[in-house]
Amino acid sequence: MTNIINGRQIAKQLNQETKTRVDKLKEEGIIPGIVVILVGDDPASVIYTRNKQKNAEKLGMKSILRKFPKDVSQAEVLQAIHHYNDDPTIHAILIQLPLPKHLNQTELIEAIAPEKDVDGFNSKNVGKLYNNEEGHYPVSCTSRGIMTLLHTYLDKIEGLNVTIVGRSILVSRPLQSLLINENATVTMVSLHTDNIDYYTKHADILVVAAGKPNLIKKDQVKPGATVIDVGINRMANHYLVGDVDFDDVKEVAKNITPVPGGVGPMTIATLMQQTVDLAEWNK
């Protein structure tokens, strides 16, 4: 029998734990604060930022949405980042991606103070993760959310073969480091990989983050595998589908995430979790 991984339910439990931590911080006079920087009016980005803001407010956090027009200058966004770096009531800064092409994404992310870099994309935090350093530092919220799902449904990760389809710096690469740090054997492939089926069919855990709807079919999946679908693709009929053909692959997978309702809710719940982490680590 296939387990449908209920990301919404696990996110709900995580949010309850986060709310308890927020209440405890408030007793100490600390209100966790997050600012989301949004450039332009891309419909998907607007929805994502509103969801993040609603979740933060629901958990009792301070939440600011800093909006800029799509033709904003690099200097204006940098000025805002520096302002929030210096604001003691803000513990977490997030830049909603993607950004317009005229903006230098790397420079903006590097401008965020590492101790407020809630998505873990600043090179100092990336380096700590890559080196498996001890201590406290944020990591990619989506990647950490995936790890939470895996820990919920699997007894162990150590020793398992993992294939990640996709090589993005936002999800795939930090997830690769998190898995390696738990002694998994990780292979990363892309749509340019020859004989991609060989790698997917040998995976105990298959993570698909390629941005191509219904890419993976059941004949590409090892029977009994755990399949994590990171893709979010809006089709012509307005339905959302993942990068995995869910109805097909669920016939062979032991555990599988749906789209929507799998990884997505975990990303936002983990963002809230890490905002509180930053408030606790830096109080």
From Swiss-Prot:
Per UniProt, the keywords (alphabetical) are:
Amino-acid biosynthesis, Histidine biosynthesis, Hydrolase, Methionine biosynthesis, Multifunctional enzyme, NADP, One-carbon metabolism, Oxidoreductase, Purine biosynthesis
Question: What does it catalyze?
Answer: (6R)-5,10-methylene-5,6,7,8-tetrahydrofolate + NADP(+) = (6R)-5,10-methenyltetrahydrofolate + NADPH; (6R)-5,10-methenyltetrahydrofolate + H2O = (6R)-10-formyltetrahydrofolate + H(+)
Give GO terms for biological process.
L-histidine biosynthetic process; methionine biosynthetic process; purine nucleotide biosynthetic process; tetrahydrofolate interconversion
Q: Which Pfam families match?
A: THF_DHG_CYH (PF00763), THF_DHG_CYH_C (PF02882)
Q: Which InterPro entries match?
A: Aminoacid_DH-like_N_sf, NAD(P)-bd_dom_sf, THF_DH/CycHdrlase, THF_DH/CycHdrlase_cat_dom, THF_DH/CycHdrlase_CS, THF_DH/CycHdrlase_NAD-bd_dom
GO terms (molecular function) for this protein are: methenyltetrahydrofolate cyclohydrolase activity; methylenetetrahydrofolate dehydrogenase (NADP+) activity
Q: Record's GO cellular component, any one?
A: cytosol
Pathway involvement? Answer: One-carbon metabolism; tetrahydrofolate interconversion
EC nos: 1.5.1.5, 3.5.4.9
SUPFAM superfamilies in the cross-refs: Aminoacid dehydrogenase-like, N-terminal domain, NAD(P)-binding Rossmann-fold domains
The UniProt annotation places NADP(+) binding at: G166, R167, S168, I232
Function according to Swiss-Prot or TrEMBL: Catalyzes the oxidation of 5,10-methylenetetrahydrofolate to 5,10-methenyltetrahydrofolate and then the hydrolysis of 5,10-methenyltetrahydrofolate to 10-formyltetrahydrofolate.
Which protein family is named in the record?
Belongs to the tetrahydrofolate dehydrogenase/cyclohydrolase family.
Partners and quaternary state? Homodimer.
Any idea what this protein is called? Bifunctional protein FolD 1
Q: What's the encoding gene here?
A: folD1
